[in-house]
């Protein structure tokens, strides 16, 4: 069904239609790309002893190559904060993990990832626009600035 739809809905130049036609349907896959508004610190704070990292906290389209990088940074920074602030001698149990670790961690994570999420959404829009097909001997960013 996906192959059929791709062939029906697109008007690509040769040889792309021929390549699609020659490709086995079992070798064609697709998946939707979703964007959503950034989460807020207020929303995350409702998880008293719970936080989100990676795509659960800041999903981004795969057009900037930052999703896995940000998820790894989230995990590393959260682990470092827990190691640093939840020592047996600290009072984190009395004040709670949210105040001890999660609030500061989430604030940093949301700030750091916000530009990556926005840049990924912008890249998705750009890569699905006519400007992406512009032929020329210059960076595409120059074309965007001229036409934008």
Regions found by a protein language model. Name each.
Residues 1-148:
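FAD-dependent flavoprotein oxygenase/oxidase catalytic domain
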């Amino acid at each position: 069904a996906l192959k059929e739809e791709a062939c029906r809905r697109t008007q690509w130049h040769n040889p792309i239609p021929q390549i699609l036609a020659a490709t086995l349907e079992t070798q064609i896959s697709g998946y939707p790309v979703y964007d959503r508004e950034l989460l807020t610190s207020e929303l995350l704070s409702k998880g008293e002893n719970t936080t989100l990292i990676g795509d659960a906290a800041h999903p981004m389209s795969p057009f900037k190559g930052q999703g896995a990088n940000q998820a790894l940074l989230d995990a590393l920074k959260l682990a470092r904060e827990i190691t640093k602030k939840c020592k047996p001698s600290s009072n984190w149990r009395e004040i709670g993990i949210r105040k001890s670790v999660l609030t500061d961690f989430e604030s940093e994570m949301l700030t750091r990832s916000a530009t990556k999420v926005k840049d990924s959404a912008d890249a998705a829009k750009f890569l699905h626009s006519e400007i992406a097909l512009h032929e020329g001997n210059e960076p595409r960013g120059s074309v965007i600035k001229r036409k934008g």
